[in-house]
């Protein structure tokens, strides 16, 4: 899933061309637009991820924000290169989904959506040889394995009583790809505008 990819990667490039911190750049835009929910998730994710502090040695961070199904999600991904491929170790997620009916279920949905989106962003492709699909089952179609799954932390923006609940089923999916791409831009200096990041 990549409905947010090009937008977030372009925003990251603009921040870097302006010589600004990616979180500070987004914050200024959200403040100017009066996008309070976007600002709240961005600030919460950045704070919990330790944005502004050095990442662990060898790792770098990327950020992305997206609104879907009435919810707003921000993610900070910690990424490094390992054997020539991106490795995502930690993802900090902040979500505004209105009234949080079941916080544990929200966290589970964010974990599953993040891993699903990460699998698609890293590996999701179908190739053809002489007009025939090469990937006929999961032994030939690469997906994210359990040992590749990152640690996912989920934080929920508190809302006043009476705020209606919004979606949590899919909003965790479209954010992770651009968050990883933006970390890779910080790491390599190269913008990634297409998925998957790892080619067959």
In which residue ranges do the predicted regions lie?
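Cofactor-binding beta-sheet edge motifs in enzyme active sites
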Residues: 1-200
């Amino acid at each position: 899933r990549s409905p947010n990819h090009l937008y977030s990667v372009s925003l990251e490039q603009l921040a870097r061309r302006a010589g600004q911190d990616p979180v500070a750049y987004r914050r200024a835009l959200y403040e100017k637009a009066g996008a309070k929910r976007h600002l709240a998730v961005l600030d919460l994710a950045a704070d919990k991820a330790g944005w502004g502090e050095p990442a662990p040695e060898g790792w770098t961070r990327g950020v992305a924000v997206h609104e879907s199904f009435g919810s707003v999600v921000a993610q900070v991904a910690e990424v490094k290169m390992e054997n020539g491929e991106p490795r995502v170790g930690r993802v900090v997620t902040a979500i505004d989904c209105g009234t949080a009916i079941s916080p544990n279920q929200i966290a589970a949905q964010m974990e599953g959506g993040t891993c699903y989106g990460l699998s698609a962003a890293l590996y999701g492709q179908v190739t053809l040889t002489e007009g025939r699909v090469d990937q006929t089952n999961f032994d030939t179609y690469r997906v994210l394995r359990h040992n590749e799954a990152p640690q996912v932390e989920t934080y929920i923006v508190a809302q006043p009583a009476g705020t209606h609940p919004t979606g949590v089923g899919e909003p965790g999916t479209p954010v992770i790809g651009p968050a990883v791409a933006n970390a890779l831009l910080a790491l390599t200096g190269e913008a990634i505008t297409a998925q998957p990041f790892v080619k067959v």
